[in-house]
Amino acid sequence: LQSVLKIINDNITNKDLTPRYIADRLAISPRSLYRKMEEIGEDSPTDLIKECRLHIAKDLLLTTKKTIDEIVFDSGFSNKVTFFKVFREKYELRMKHLEEVRQ
């Protein structure tokens, strides 16, 4: 798991960061990656990538004055629509409310 997290953290802004990308770096098949993560009781690689990106975005939102566009890019999301959707699903908070709190 540590090697998976290192690959994710080292490549978080890489739009090509996918389970296949991680598996290639570990010299295993994507199926083997999913299986190994399941065996240790972890989320899927896709969910782990999303969680890491959300954690970074939340930290940037709370600790910086960066714009939403900058935060979307810096946390590795491909676009604002995707970011807003997964952020709302995870934190049950709309961006409008968060922007009000940040001011």
Residue positions per predicted region:
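…primarily DNA-binding HTH/wHTH and HhH modules…
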Residues: K85-Q103
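Short coil turns linking two alpha-helices in DNA-binding domains
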Residues: R25, S29-P30, S78-N79
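Terminal helix-turn-helix DNA-binding modules in bacterial transcription factors
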Residues: E39-S78, E100-Q103
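Residues within the alpha-helical elements of helix-turn-helix
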Residues: Y21, R25, D74-S75
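Residues within helix-turn-helix
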Residues: R20, R31, T67-E70, V81
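Basic, amphipathic alpha-helical hairpins
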Residues: L5-L17, M37-G41, K58-T67, F87, ...
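Short hydrophobic/aromatic patch on the recognition helix
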Residues: L33-Y34, T82-F83, F87
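Extended, amphipathic alpha-helices with heptad-repeat/coiled-coil or helix-bundle character
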Residues: D24-R25, Y34-I40
